[in-house]
Amino acid sequence: MQGHPEVAVLRYGHRPGRDDRMTTHVGLTARALGADRVVFPDNAGQSEQTVADITERFGGPFDVELTDELNAFIRDWGGAVVHLTMYGERVQDVEDEIRRAHSEDRQPVLVVVGGEKVPFDVYEEADWNVGVTNQPHSEVAGLAVFLDRLFDGAELEGEYEDADQRVIPQALGKRVEDLDEE
């Protein structure tokens, strides 16, 4: 989110065919809720293209990239690593500490979101293993709640630059405005 140290989301693991929609939604959620970029495994090219297309149409800044070195990406990260897992410490117990590291200590934050069985190395590399409710549910829901807690709701007021289209909020119906006609 602009004005803060970087927040990146790393999708750890992707099963083509099975995880395509979920991986795409991890990227879209990261973009919509204040992250600066998402990094997908190199076999998630379809998701990368979809998120890049949405960013082009609805604005950024937001970067999307692929890597074939997930463990190295975590190991080489130059800031705090938060691994979202239902087995982690309760988000409400650690959110203040993580928010302080990000905003006061100016540390970039990498949020690791698992897509399949995450190896124990990831748990060990993480500065925080964080659970949202410590119950089984969607990793997209966990990411959304975590980012909202990290940014304390400020991401909901986000402005998007260089958009071709904009959704016009309405009580009823759908309205999308083409901005290049203005």
Regions of interest found by a model, annotated:
Residues 48-121:
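S-adenosyl-L-methionine/SAH cofactor-binding core of RNA-modifying enzymes
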